[in-house]
A protein has these predicted regions:
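Short amphipathic
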Residues: 4-11
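Active-site His/Glu-centered metal-binding helix of metallohydrolases
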Residues: 43, 47, 51
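Glycine- and Gly-Pro-enriched alpha-helical subdomains that act as flexible
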Residues: 52-92
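Short glycine-rich, basic-tinged beta-strand/loop micro-motifs
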Residues: 93-105
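A short glycine/serine-rich beta->alpha loop
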Residues: 28-38, 66-71, 106
């Protein structure tokens, strides 16, 4: 019998000037980037959170805190590799990942 576990991950970072935009480990050519302690890759962060949750291993902030010098500007693919290693210590492996990215830029107008 298969032991299937499902996790749900969610992450949000603000778009700002002066940062690179990383999504799913790919650098996108865009004038804004996501603000964060690491590279702020929201897709990878949400995936890490989902994997950790499915394994009942808390969340990404617990394992990779934004107060750690080790995670400052880190490539989120490294966090994903470490997360996969963490869940492997509990006997779990990734069978499938399904992710949806919701993104928008809010524009405001002086007209009311």
């Amino acid at each position: 019998m298969m032991n299937i576990r499902v996790g749900f991950g969610y992450d949000v970072h603000k778009l700002v000037a002066g940062r690179e935009l990383w999504l799913g480990g790919i650098k996108l050519n865009y004038e804004l980037g996501l603000l964060g302690h690491s590279d702020a890759d929201v897709l990878i962060h949400a995936i890490c959170d989902a994997l950790l949750g499915a394994a009942n291993m808390r969340d990404i902030g617990y394992h990779f805190p934004d107060t750690s010098a080790e995670t400052l500007n880190v490539d989120s693919k490294i966090l994903l590799r470490k997360t996969i290693g963490l869940i492997a210590t509990k006997g779990y492996q990734v069978g499938n990942i399904d992710a949806t990215v919701c993104a928008c830029l809010l524009y405001t107008s002086d007209a009311a």
